[in-house]
Amino acid sequence: MALITVKNVSFYYEKNMVVENLSFEVNAGDYLCVVGENGSGKSTLIKGLLRLKQPESGEIAIGDGLKANEVGYLPQQTAAQKDFPGGVYEVVLSGRLSSRGIRPFYTAKDKQIAKENMELLNISDLANRCYRELSGGQQQRVLLARALCATRKLILLDEPVSGLDPLVTQEFYGTVAQLNRNANITVIMVSHDIQSAVKYATHILHLQNEQAFFGKTEEYLRTTLAKSFIGGAENV
């Protein structure tokens, strides 16, 4: 059974259609990149997958043992978030909040999971640093470790490289790809960076306020839609 099944889903804001007729599946081990122009419904879809927004019609179902609170999420960073004064370890550990439930404290298991994910992303040496003093790339690694604390199955990333320089961007994409291949973490990523999307993703979902394409990356690259979109991105 698929981790996520989206069937005939449409989203509206104040009676205005944002995206409609979405039907696709995400299976364990997939790396799905969601692409499209601004306003095409990408971030709205992510909110729907996180159950922060209910679809006007259709159904989003989770399966294969995945629980609603076992989805790691890395949102776009705001300026205020980048200036968060807390420590790195504190930020990473907060990824266990959904698992903590009503307990007023973190368990030894929570703390161990946080340390393991910091080691996985090579940021253990930053544990005692202040988050806002880190570089943009370091901050994104911290937030990725935080997202992994919530799950061992699926992470959602919404424009995770926004504002990063090209070298750091490619390093971050490489890190996510390694998590997908080596740790069997399923990835759903919203990105404007179509070149990196087709380089790393196993599947592409292209939105144009509807489902313009969903399928394997190699199939997408053969479409007129992909050639037009990639060509346009190269000229930006």
Question: Model-derived features: where do they sit?
Answer:
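Helix N-cap at the start of a conserved alpha-helix in ABC-type nucleotide-binding domains
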Residues: 166-168
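H-loop/switch region of ABC-family ATPase nucleotide-binding domains
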Residues: 191-192
